[in-house]
Design a protein with these regions (language model features):
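Peripheral, non-transmembrane regulatory/ligand-interaction domains of membrane transport proteins
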Residues: 1-204
Length: 205
């Protein structure tokens, strides 16, 4: 799915087609949608990397200035699965005309922006927009960690009361989520450090 947005003076508006200085959000794009992005100057490799579930957080910059930022963000799979919270790669692609986000999943991080809940958001200030996405991803990690801690605390109370294997297995599920989060945050830290060193990445536009 492809979605297009551009801000006016007050709100973020959804568009029917891409225009200069818009935000393009790609969620598990089809082959035709990937080709459409390529026709807009987005490297196919950047799209492919962003959709690879095992992709690590990193930065890549082309000679023409097009930049790929890959970070891992939290994703809630549901309570009745082996690992309730995992992380997925989010690609942020910056060109001279667009900011493009690419992810296999529909995530809370991106939906907050798409819903128009982010104040003073400018699609023309692409680098700043990217930084706000990164900040939101960090906030989502904190929110999900609080939720995990709350669940684990409740499971510990049940464990002390019952000493049943069920509670132990449930706690193990959330322990796996801790591991995923720790690995992702370490990768993101290195990627953010590299962003701070990019000469082409201006923090204020």
């Amino acid at each position: 799915m492809l979605r297009y947005y551009k801000n006016n003076e007050l709100i973020l508006e959804k568009l029917d087609e891409p225009v200069t200085n818009c935000w393009i959000d790609a969620i598990n794009p089809t082959p035709d949608e990937k080709q459409l992005l390529c026709n807009l100057g987005i490297p196919m490799d950047f799209i492919t990397y962003s959709l690879d579930i095992d992709e690590r957080s990193r930065i890549e910059e082309e000679d023409n200035g097009t930049t790929l930022i890959v970070v891992r963000i939290p994703y809630f799979m549901g309570e009745n699965v082996d690992i309730p919270y995992i992380t997925v790669p989010l690609g942020i692609i910056l060109t001279d005309k667009y900011i493009v986000t690419v992810c296999e999943k529909s995530t809370e991080t991106i939906e907050m922006f798409a819903s128009g809940k982010a104040p003073k958001l400018s699609t023309t200030k692409r680098n700043r927009f990217a930084l706000r996405i990164l900040m939101r991803g960090t906030t989502n990690f904190l929110d999900d960690l609080r939720a995990i801690n709350k669940t684990v605390d409740a499971l510990e109370d049940k464990l002390y009361a019952s000493m049943q294997n069920t509670e132990l297995l449930e706690m193990l599920k959330y322990q796996k989520s801790y591991v995923y989060f720790a690995q992702a945050l370490k990768q993101n830290e290195l990627a953010l450090y590299r962003i701070s060193k990019l000469s082409s990445f201006k923090k204020y536009e």
